Regions:
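Residue-level signal for pocket-adjacent positions within structured domains
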Residues: 39, 48, 73, 80, ...
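Nudix hydrolase/Nudix homology domain
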Residues: 2-19, 131, 144-198
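Short N-terminal secondary-structure initiator segments
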Residues: 1-26, 93-111
Length: 198
Protein backbone atom coordinates (compact mmCIF):
# COMPACT_ATOMS: atom_id res chain seq x y z
CA UNK A 1 0.00 0.00 0.00
CA UNK A 2 1.42 3.37 -0.99
CA UNK A 3 1.84 5.74 1.95
CA UNK A 4 0.60 9.34 2.02
CA UNK A 5 3.20 11.81 0.74
CA UNK A 6 5.33 14.23 2.79
CA UNK A 7 3.01 17.13 1.94
CA UNK A 8 0.33 15.57 4.16
CA UNK A 9 2.64 15.58 7.19
CA UNK A 10 3.74 19.16 6.52
CA UNK A 11 0.18 20.36 6.00
CA UNK A 12 -1.05 18.53 9.11
CA UNK A 13 1.52 20.43 11.17
CA UNK A 14 0.44 23.68 9.51
CA UNK A 15 -3.26 22.96 10.10
CA UNK A 16 -2.83 22.21 13.80
CA UNK A 17 -0.30 25.00 14.36
CA UNK A 18 -2.64 27.65 12.99
CA UNK A 19 -5.73 26.42 14.87
CA UNK A 20 -6.56 27.98 18.23
CA UNK A 21 -8.99 26.67 20.83
CA UNK A 22 -10.08 28.18 24.13
CA UNK A 23 -10.70 24.73 25.64
CA UNK A 24 -7.74 23.65 27.85
CA UNK A 25 -8.31 19.96 27.13
CA UNK A 26 -8.39 20.53 23.38
CA UNK A 27 -5.31 22.75 23.58
CA UNK A 28 -3.44 20.00 25.43
CA UNK A 29 -4.44 17.54 22.70
CA UNK A 30 -3.39 20.00 19.99
CA UNK A 31 0.07 20.21 21.56
CA UNK A 32 0.19 16.42 21.92
CA UNK A 33 -0.75 15.95 18.25
CA UNK A 34 1.98 18.38 17.20
CA UNK A 35 4.48 16.57 19.43
CA UNK A 36 3.53 13.26 17.84
CA UNK A 37 3.93 14.73 14.36
CA UNK A 38 7.36 16.11 15.33
CA UNK A 39 8.44 12.71 16.63
CA UNK A 40 7.08 10.59 13.78
CA UNK A 41 7.72 11.34 10.11
CA UNK A 42 5.14 8.64 9.29
CA UNK A 43 2.51 9.95 11.75
CA UNK A 44 -0.10 10.17 8.97
CA UNK A 45 0.46 6.60 7.74
CA UNK A 46 -1.75 3.77 8.96
CA UNK A 47 1.42 1.63 9.07
CA UNK A 48 2.76 3.72 11.99
CA UNK A 49 2.15 1.22 14.80
CA UNK A 50 2.56 3.77 17.62
CA UNK A 51 -0.50 5.56 16.24
CA UNK A 52 -1.48 7.72 13.30
CA UNK A 53 -3.53 10.75 12.40
CA UNK A 54 -7.00 10.14 11.01
CA UNK A 55 -9.57 12.57 9.62
CA UNK A 56 -13.27 12.69 10.51
CA UNK A 57 -16.27 14.77 9.51
CA UNK A 58 -19.33 15.83 11.46
CA UNK A 59 -21.79 16.09 8.56
CA UNK A 60 -24.77 18.40 9.10
CA UNK A 61 -27.67 18.78 6.69
CA UNK A 62 -28.40 22.07 4.93
CA UNK A 63 -30.68 23.21 7.76
CA UNK A 64 -28.05 22.49 10.41
CA UNK A 65 -30.65 20.51 12.36
CA UNK A 66 -29.55 16.92 11.62
CA UNK A 67 -26.28 15.01 11.50
CA UNK A 68 -25.41 11.98 9.38
CA UNK A 69 -23.97 9.08 11.37
CA UNK A 70 -22.65 5.69 10.32
CA UNK A 71 -23.17 2.43 12.18
CA UNK A 72 -19.54 1.35 12.21
CA UNK A 73 -19.10 -2.37 11.42
CA UNK A 74 -16.02 -2.87 13.60
CA UNK A 75 -17.06 -0.68 16.55
CA UNK A 76 -20.77 -1.52 16.43
CA UNK A 77 -21.84 2.03 17.37
CA UNK A 78 -23.08 5.15 15.60
CA UNK A 79 -20.15 7.43 14.78
CA UNK A 80 -19.27 10.42 12.63
CA UNK A 81 -17.86 9.66 9.17
CA UNK A 82 -14.10 9.41 8.72
CA UNK A 83 -11.07 7.20 8.46
CA UNK A 84 -7.44 6.81 7.48
CA UNK A 85 -5.45 9.13 5.27
CA UNK A 86 -4.75 7.80 1.77
CA UNK A 87 -1.90 8.38 -0.73
CA UNK A 88 -3.90 10.95 -2.71
CA UNK A 89 -4.62 13.13 0.34
CA UNK A 90 -2.54 16.30 0.45
CA UNK A 91 -3.91 17.54 3.76
CA UNK A 92 -6.27 16.57 6.57
CA UNK A 93 -9.08 18.68 5.12
CA UNK A 94 -9.04 16.78 1.82
CA UNK A 95 -8.82 13.47 3.71
CA UNK A 96 -11.88 14.31 5.84
CA UNK A 97 -13.83 15.52 2.80
CA UNK A 98 -12.91 12.41 0.79
CA UNK A 99 -13.96 10.11 3.64
CA UNK A 100 -17.25 11.98 4.12
CA UNK A 101 -18.01 11.82 0.39
CA UNK A 102 -17.11 8.12 0.08
CA UNK A 103 -19.04 7.04 3.17
CA UNK A 104 -22.13 9.21 2.57
CA UNK A 105 -22.40 8.97 -1.21
CA UNK A 106 -23.28 12.68 -1.19
CA UNK A 107 -21.70 15.01 -3.75
CA UNK A 108 -21.31 18.72 -3.16
CA UNK A 109 -20.30 18.53 0.50
CA UNK A 110 -18.65 21.68 1.88
CA UNK A 111 -16.03 21.56 4.63
CA UNK A 112 -14.84 24.18 7.09
CA UNK A 113 -11.02 23.87 6.91
CA UNK A 114 -10.59 24.70 10.61
CA UNK A 115 -10.49 21.69 12.94
CA UNK A 116 -13.62 21.33 15.05
CA UNK A 117 -12.45 18.82 17.64
CA UNK A 118 -9.55 16.50 18.45
CA UNK A 119 -9.67 13.06 20.01
CA UNK A 120 -7.20 10.24 20.61
CA UNK A 121 -8.44 6.71 21.20
CA UNK A 122 -7.10 3.16 21.24
CA UNK A 123 -8.20 0.93 18.37
CA UNK A 124 -7.26 -2.25 16.57
CA UNK A 125 -6.96 -1.31 12.91
CA UNK A 126 -7.56 -3.47 9.87
CA UNK A 127 -3.93 -4.61 10.11
CA UNK A 128 -4.89 -6.35 13.38
CA UNK A 129 -2.40 -4.38 15.48
CA UNK A 130 -3.47 -2.38 18.57
CA UNK A 131 -2.70 1.28 17.95
CA UNK A 132 -4.06 4.78 18.55
CA UNK A 133 -6.00 7.12 16.29
CA UNK A 134 -5.13 10.80 16.61
CA UNK A 135 -8.41 11.94 15.09
CA UNK A 136 -8.84 15.45 13.68
CA UNK A 137 -12.54 16.25 13.20
CA UNK A 138 -13.96 18.84 10.79
CA UNK A 139 -17.39 20.37 10.25
CA UNK A 140 -19.03 19.47 6.92
CA UNK A 141 -22.32 20.71 5.46
CA UNK A 142 -24.44 18.76 3.00
CA UNK A 143 -26.31 20.51 0.16
CA UNK A 144 -30.08 20.97 0.12
CA UNK A 145 -31.99 17.72 -0.61
CA UNK A 146 -28.84 15.60 -0.19
CA UNK A 147 -29.48 11.87 -0.57
CA UNK A 148 -27.15 9.53 1.28
CA UNK A 149 -26.09 6.18 -0.22
CA UNK A 150 -25.03 3.30 2.03
CA UNK A 151 -21.51 2.07 1.29
CA UNK A 152 -19.76 -1.19 2.11
CA UNK A 153 -17.99 0.66 4.95
CA UNK A 154 -21.21 1.04 6.96
CA UNK A 155 -23.80 -1.29 8.46
CA UNK A 156 -26.27 1.59 8.31
CA UNK A 157 -26.30 5.30 7.52
CA UNK A 158 -28.88 7.61 9.02
CA UNK A 159 -29.74 11.26 9.67
CA UNK A 160 -30.41 12.05 13.33
CA UNK A 161 -31.94 15.26 14.73
CA UNK A 162 -29.31 17.04 16.82
CA UNK A 163 -31.70 17.00 19.76
CA UNK A 164 -32.32 13.25 19.48
CA UNK A 165 -28.96 11.56 19.00
CA UNK A 166 -28.75 7.80 19.62
CA UNK A 167 -27.24 6.53 22.87
CA UNK A 168 -23.53 5.73 23.16
CA UNK A 169 -22.34 7.99 20.35
CA UNK A 170 -18.89 8.72 21.76
CA UNK A 171 -18.04 12.43 21.45
CA UNK A 172 -20.66 13.30 18.81
CA UNK A 173 -22.68 15.48 21.25
CA UNK A 174 -19.52 17.46 22.05
CA UNK A 175 -18.87 18.00 18.35
CA UNK A 176 -22.49 19.06 17.79
CA UNK A 177 -22.18 21.61 20.59
CA UNK A 178 -18.97 22.99 19.08
CA UNK A 179 -20.60 23.15 15.64
CA UNK A 180 -23.55 25.11 17.04
CA UNK A 181 -21.20 27.54 18.80
CA UNK A 182 -19.26 28.04 15.58
CA UNK A 183 -22.46 28.57 13.58
CA UNK A 184 -23.70 31.13 16.10
CA UNK A 185 -20.41 33.00 15.92
CA UNK A 186 -20.51 33.01 12.12
CA UNK A 187 -24.10 34.29 12.15
CA UNK A 188 -23.13 37.16 14.46
CA UNK A 189 -20.29 38.01 12.10
CA UNK A 190 -22.66 37.85 9.12
CA UNK A 191 -20.79 34.98 7.48
CA UNK A 192 -21.17 31.24 7.02
CA UNK A 193 -17.47 30.92 7.87
CA UNK A 194 -14.73 29.59 5.61
CA UNK A 195 -15.74 26.62 3.50
CA UNK A 196 -14.04 24.44 0.93
CA UNK A 197 -16.38 22.90 -1.67
CA UNK A 198 -16.16 19.20 -2.40
Amino acid sequence: VTAPGPDLHTNAVRCLSSWRTADPGQEALRQAFLGFLAAKADACHRSCEAGHLTASALVLDATGERTLLTLHPRVGRWLQLGGHCEPEDTDLVSAALREATEESGITGLRIDPRPLHLDVHEVTCSLGVPTRHFDVRFLVRAPVAAREVLSAESLDLRWFPLAALPADVDSVPTMVSLAMTRAAGAAEAGSAGPVVPG
